[in-house]
Amino acid sequence: MENFDKVKDIIVDRLGVDADKVTEDASFKDDLGADSLDIAELVMELEDEFGTEIPDEEAEKINTVGDAVKFINSLEK
């Protein structure tokens, strides 16, 4: 499973949104209805899923689904 698909599954599960709404350009707040607590929980779940720690300064830059995928992909290089 590619990173995008893993991230998408986490978002659908955590936020209860339709999978069709989860695109790389989708904003967590504006398009998916996430609040700051939802985003913090998503970050923790991403950390668990990918076995990493996302520093707060990096987490603050994750505003879209694509941002999350790019960050995860950058860890694998």
Curated annotation (Swiss-Prot):
InterPro entries (alphabetical): ACP, ACP-like_sf, PP-bd_ACP, Ppantetheine_attach_site
Localisation: Cytoplasm
Pathway where this protein functions: Lipid metabolism; fatty acid biosynthesis
Lineage top rank: taxon: Bacteria
Keywords, in A-Z order: Cytoplasm, Fatty acid biosynthesis, Fatty acid metabolism, Lipid biosynthesis, Lipid metabolism, Phosphopantetheine, Phosphoprotein
PTM remark: 4'-phosphopantetheine is transferred from CoA to a specific serine of apo-ACP by AcpS. This modification is essential for activity because fatty acids are bound in thioester linkage to the sulfhydryl of the prosthetic group.
Modified residues (O-(pantetheine 4'-phosphoryl)serine): 36
Pfam families cross-referenced by the UniProt entry: PP-binding
GO biological process, one term: lipid A biosynthetic process
Protein function: Carrier of the growing fatty acid chain in fatty acid biosynthesis.
Similarity section: Belongs to the acyl carrier protein (ACP) family.
PANTHER family: ACYL CARRIER PROTEIN (PTHR20863), CARRIER DOMAIN-CONTAINING PROTEIN (PTHR20863:SF76)
Protein name, as recorded: Acyl carrier protein
Species this protein is from: Staphylococcus aureus (strain COL)
Gene: acpP
